[in-house]
Structure formats: structure tokens, C-alpha cells
Amino acid sequence: GIGALGDIGCYSLDMVLNAIGYPKPLTVSGYKSDFFGKNPATYADRGHPEYADIFGVDDFAAAFVRLEGDIILDFRIAWAMNINTPGDTIILGTKAGLRIPSTNCWNGSVGGPMTIYHTVAGEQVETKIPIIETHDSYNIFDKKVRSFVEAVQNGGKAPVPSSQIFYNQAIIDGIMKSHRAGHEIEIKLPEC
């Protein structure tokens, strides 16, 4: 089955794909593991080691994804691991780099101000991008729901293009298929 990859992986994948313009996925080499979920010791403190026998989803997944535009994505997601986080999201471009701090739980936010690493007047500099504070009672999730409701009420366009959902899920499906095949696979997409 699908666990961390589909449950929380879709959100972190969406974040990085949005940051780079949602390019079309071409190939993927993927891996997934259920080591922690299948290990009875994981449940020992809860008194239910038998849960390991019925665990049926991944707790870790990783992939190397080739995207249109000669873009490479090194992707990792986990809900169980021997470290506090799989790490910040890092985008390395030819003109600059971007670090998006990780968060403990994906809730639509980031773990702190983002940093752009770039050259200004021949010098390497770091530019912090502050988190914009809102002065209303709505968080980012509330605002996303509101934009969807308004699109439905007013007959407007969906706030998230269907192609983005399609690409995101094609990558996740590709990770699963590549893991089963044991090698890189081509992502075949119908025209949309």
C-alpha cells in the first residue's frame, strides 16, 4: 500500500513543483520501505507488537525524478526514521539556490523564513524571505478552502489546475511502480 508517500509526500512534492513552475515529469527511479511499520519493536511501548503483522504501507520513500527542462528532483519523505526530519527543501538553480526550512508536520506552512543564496555585485549573499504575517483569523489552509469555495460559487476556475494534480500523482504512482520494477521507469502521461 501507500503510506507516507501518498499521505504527506503529495504536499511536499506539490510545494517544490510549484516553486519551479510544475514541469512535466519524464522518468522516475523510486524506492519505498516499511521497515519501521513492520518492526514489532516500533509498537512495544504501546503494548501492541501485533500491529507489525498488519502494517501494509510505506513509512519512507525516495526518488530521483527527471522533469522537463533538464530539471532533476531528489525527493524523500518519511513519517518514521532515525532522525528528526528528512531535511529542508533545497532548490539548486544555475543562478541561485533556495532553502525552505522543514516543518514538523506539513500544514501548509514552512518551518521558518526561506533563504535565497545568490551573487550580488560579484559576492555570494544570503537573502532571507520573511514569512508574511496575516492580521486576520484565517490561516493558509482556511484561505485555500475559501478560494475553492469562491470558485465553485462564482463558476470560476479551480485554484489548483488539474494538470498539477495529475503530475503530482503521476510522480507518486511512478515511485511505486519503479520500486516494484527495481529500476527507473518512464512516466507516460496522456495529453491533458
Kindly give the residue locations of the regions a language model identified.
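Conserved phosphate-coordination/catalytic loops
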Residues: 7, 139-142, 166
